[in-house]
A protein has these predicted regions:
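ABC ATPase nucleotide-binding domains
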Residues: 1-106
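Surface-exposed loop/turn and secondary-structure junction residues enriched for glycine/proline
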Residues: 11-14, 41, 48, 63, ...
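Small-residue-enriched segments and motifs
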Residues: 51, 105, 119, 166-171
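Non-catalytic connector elements of ABC transporters
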Residues: 114-116, 125-228
Length: 228
């Protein structure tokens, strides 16, 4: 190694990470704790080190506990996940279940969901008082549900006969790197109600004829039912 004669402080961030992992593995541990292992690195170096780390840990026979706020990092490297909210751990679940049915708002936020609203169960639907909407969920809604989550990419431009379609006013449009983010106010929403975030391909947004008033829809199965 070209840096074998340097002190730890003289190493770059990536070299320090590699050195730390080598020291850990040299002690032949039965478990490894990785606490935000890439938090101080730029995106390219993080990508390179993540690939190296995943390959190295692939041959590790013990348990790895990976602490992270990065949902992509968790999704790529972990099989099971446990959300900690205000010092309390929630039940351990699979990655698929976390993204499909997070169960709580804390878990939904960690999974990347951007839209939330108070909810009142209505058999197989929910009433959202802040937005003045009743949305079908396509399955029975438990009595304990008090919030719902909607992922930004599940808010869609409504086609003919779309279920859960409603009219909105576009309040703000934000051009992201590869997509367009539109912040919407549903008709009948309370003045202080949170805006609804929709994210779509740039080409799809450019093709919208009326960019001020839109009709959007949310698939029933895409509504996340959340308890406190």
């Amino acid at each position: 190694l070209e840096w074998k004669d340097k002190s730890y402080r003289e190493l770059s961030g990536g070299q320090q990470q590699r050195c730390a992992l080598a020291r850990i593995l040299a002690s032949e541990p039965t478990a490894i704790l990785l606490d935000e292992p890439f938090s101080a690195l730029d995106s390219y170096l993080k990508y390179q080190l993540e690939l190296e780390l995943a390959e190295t840990l692939g041959g590790f026979p013990g348990t790895v506990l990976w602490v992270s706020h990065d949902r992509g990092e968790v999704f790529r490297n972990c099989r099971r996940v446990c959300v900690i909210d205000r010092g309390r751990s929630q039940p351990v679940t699979t990655l698929g279940e976390l993204f499909r049915s997070p169960g709580t708002e804390a878990a939904a936020r960690l999974s990347g969901c951007k839209n939330y609203a108070d909810a009142r169960p209505r058999e197989d639907a929910v009433f959202l008082p802040d937005w003045g909407l009743t949305l079908s969920c396509g399955r029975p809604v438990p009595e304990g549900v008090c919030r719902i989550g909607i992922r930004a990419h599940h808010v869609q431009l409504a086609g003919p006969g779309a279920e859960n379609a409603f009219s909105c006013t576009a309040v703000k449009v934000v051009e992201d790197v590869f997509s367009t983010i539109v912040l919407l106010r549903p008709e009948g929403a309370a003045p202080e109600a949170p805006l609804l975030r929709m994210e779509l391909d740039k080409d799809n947004w450019q093709a919208v004829p009326d960019k001020d008033r839109l009709t959007v829809s949310v698939p029933p199965e895409a509504i996340l039912l959340l308890e406190s």
